[in-house]
Amino acid sequence: MDDKSMARGRKAFVTGFPIKHSRSPLIHGFWLKELGIDGSYEAVEVKPEDFSSFAASLAANGFAGGNVTIPHKEAAYAAAESLDEAACAIGAVNTLWLENGRLCGGNTDAYGFAANLDASAPGWDKADRALVLGAGGASRAVVHALLSRGVCHVSVVNRTLSRAEELAAHFGARVYAHGWDEAQALVSNAGLIVNTTALGMSGHGEGQDFPIDLTCAPKEAVATNIVYVPLRTAFLNKAEKAGLKTVDGLGMLLHQAVPGFERWFGQRPQVTQALREHILADMAKAGAL
């Protein structure tokens, strides 16, 4: 039996609360059509108080698995009977699948972050030092990716220092916590600068100047944002003006979807320019560029 026959009729999902904004159905729908797989992928809105029962009934509802987004990633971590290494390190699950009747959980955010940089800025992981702006949930996946790829020194800057200290303590050696007032001084020797903050996102000071001068960064440094709405944030615009290589966050969204699709439908999809343009067209239609 070939992969397409095995995947025939398989169902997968993305769940969150709210979920109508998700572009995951567009991504997976594109791949299902491109690969000629007779499967489906749908958005399912689940309230936080209903998540446990939803996760327990995946098989009964005919799902092979699915993606999990805000606010359910920690609940999915707790619900999974088996976790992959990334989920254990990050403490959150964004991908669920069934294996021999067991609910398994993984986290593909770190993979997506690194794969996006591999595609758009090859050699980024030669940087000895990285600067991560922000210490929220998303920064955990970024730090895990950086450590996994051998970055020697990761500085995490956050307005609330205790959040950065908590993250540094979680990952241990090679991760250092700093207050926001130290960010400027850390730019000068950072080979990679990652913005995980909401600064510059839609509804979070969009259009305002980014509050850090990036002109003193090493000329070979790479600057990347993990958000993709808007595509070109104030941070990326400022980095570009400073002459740095910039990588937007859309590729992370696309690449993090790859492992889950392969688990549910049996074929590994490719992140292509055609897929990127498909999502950009939808963003343009929604006024999200």
Curated annotation (Swiss-Prot):
Enzyme Commission identifier(s): 1.1.1.25
A GO biological process held by the record: amino acid biosynthetic process
Keywords carried by this UniProt record: Amino-acid biosynthesis, Aromatic amino acid biosynthesis, NADP, Oxidoreductase
Oligomer and partners: Homodimer.
UniProt similarity note: Belongs to the shikimate dehydrogenase family.
Binding site for shikimate: 22-24, 69, 94, 109, 228
Pathway: Metabolic intermediate biosynthesis; chorismate biosynthesis; chorismate from D-erythrose 4-phosphate and phosphoenolpyruvate: step 4/7
Coiled coil: none
One Gene Ontology cellular component annotation held by this UniProt entry: cytosol
Presence of keyword Amino-acid biosynthesis: yes
Gene Ontology molecular-function annotations: NADP binding; shikimate 3-dehydrogenase (NADP+) activity
Full protein name: Shikimate dehydrogenase (NADP(+))
Positions of the catalytic residues: 73 (proton acceptor)
Enzyme type, top EC level: oxidoreductase
Gene3D superfamilies, A to Z: Leucine Dehydrogenase, chain A, domain 1, NAD(P)-binding Rossmann-like Domain
Binding-site list for NADP(+): 85, 134-138, 158-163, 226, 249
Organism field: Brucella suis biovar 1 (strain 1330)
